[in-house]
Amino acid sequence: MSASRKTLVVTNDFPPRIGGIQSYLRDFIATQDPESIVVFASTQNAEEAHAYDKTLDYEVIRWPRSVMLPTPTTAHAMAEIIREREIDNVWFGAAAPLALMAGTAKQAGASKVIASTHGHEVGWSMLPGSRQSLRKIGTEVDVLTYISQYTLRRFKSAFGSHPTFEHLPSGVDVKRFTPATPEDKSATRKKLGFTDTTPVIACNSRLVPRKGQDSLIKAMPQVIAARPDAQLLIVGSGRYESTLRRLATDVSQNVKFLGRLEYQDMINTLAAADIFAMPARTRGGGLDVEGLGIVYLEAQACGVPVIAGTSGGAPETVTPATGLVVEGSDVDKLSELLIELLDDPIRRAAMGAAGRAHVEAEWSWEIMGERLTNILQSEPR
């Protein structure tokens, strides 16, 4: 790919700092020719950043502050990199606010500017001042990527009609997220203290109100009445944990808080479940919403049927053959769906197989990487 258009990725969200946008950029960049990529990123911890950057096969230039803002000083530094590295594309890893520097990128010689959205722009679009910022970004970038049809519907008018909108959600590593063999599933369940026939519901996410772990706990008395040995596994950490633990007091024998697991342990736990459920619900008058929900897709890749919430883009991750959708605050309906699936192993197996096929066909990193390559390597319109 010697003729590749060279891309400068400008971002505050880059490893070793942990987070969703950081993972999104890291994994998308890994699908590209490393010689075509330069990253310009902020620095949260200089020592950790230096050690991490040495492991990469593309160049990373660090802004020596923990936050990069679209100031004249930052814009000047970015422009220097564009000129010195003969950059063709500038890709703002998160559109707001750094893509306010899109005009400077063009003036410095970049012929195409791409900016990615991740869902928080929905909130920006609802506030007059920040909505004006989105319109300025929309008038200066060439391509805006979005993670779900829901987020696009919510903020498209704020950005205006100038940019091309491209669907670019995260992919799933279908080589790591795979259905468990019977032996591996049994071993994971034994480690958790379960048998091969224990009904297991898993939820893997940050512990925050939007994700719906509280609704799952509230549904457990009805589930336990139908299946007394049913177990709910809550994987993850967050500020809502103490509230959830108090809520689970009366069902503590059937609810296990596993905390944040190592990556492979998380996958093993997910693949050992009978159902993955995260009944996400929109909160804060529409400001607190599920942009997409990659965990639903990871569960499907593991061959596990899914119960998703109605919030934001969550319903877009499943098909009628692979998962069910429920209003996250409707505990009675949630418990009904959980019991129906736990009582029907044939249906669960069919949904799991369909889920795996769905993710392989539509959501793998190979597919998403090709989509990004087309965006970056196509000539400006």
From Swiss-Prot:
The gene is pimB. GO terms for molecular function: glycolipid 1,6-alpha-mannosyltransferase activity; phosphatidylinositol alpha-mannosyltransferase activity. Involved in the biosynthesis of phosphatidyl-myo-inositol mannosides (PIM) which are early precursors in the biosynthesis of lipomannans (LM) and lipoarabinomannans (LAM). Catalyzes the addition of a mannosyl residue from GDP-D-mannose (GDP-Man) to the position 6 of a phosphatidyl-myo-inositol bearing an alpha-1,2-linked mannose residue (PIM1) to generate phosphatidyl-myo-inositol bearing alpha-1,2- and alpha-1,6-linked mannose residues (Ac1PIM2). Pfam families: Glyco_transf_4 (PF13439), Glycos_transf_1 (PF00534). GO terms for cellular component: membrane. Disruption phenotype: Cells lacking this gene are unable to produce monoacylated phosphatidyl-myo-inositol dimannoside (Ac1PIM2) resulting in the accumulation of Ac1PIM1, the absence of LAM and LM-A, and the presence of LM-B. Belongs to the glycosyltransferase group 1 family. Glycosyltransferase 4 subfamily. The keyword Transferase applies. The lineage of its organism: Bacteria, Bacillati, Actinomycetota, Actinomycetes, Mycobacteriales. PANTHER family: SULFOQUINOVOSYL TRANSFERASE SQD2. GDP-alpha-D-mannose binds at residues 206, 211, 261, 298. Transmembrane segments: none annotated. Keywords: Glycosyltransferase, Lipid biosynthesis, Lipid metabolism, Phospholipid biosynthesis, Phospholipid metabolism, Transferase. It comes from Corynebacterium glutamicum (strain ATCC 13032 / DSM 20300 / JCM 1318 / BCRC 11384 / CCUG 27702 / LMG 3730 / NBRC 12168 / NCIMB 10025 / NRRL B-2784 / 534). It comes from the Bacteria. This is GDP-mannose-dependent monoacylated alpha-(1-6)-phosphatidylinositol monomannoside mannosyltransferase. Pathway: Phospholipid metabolism; phosphatidylinositol metabolism. Its EC number is 2.4.1.346.
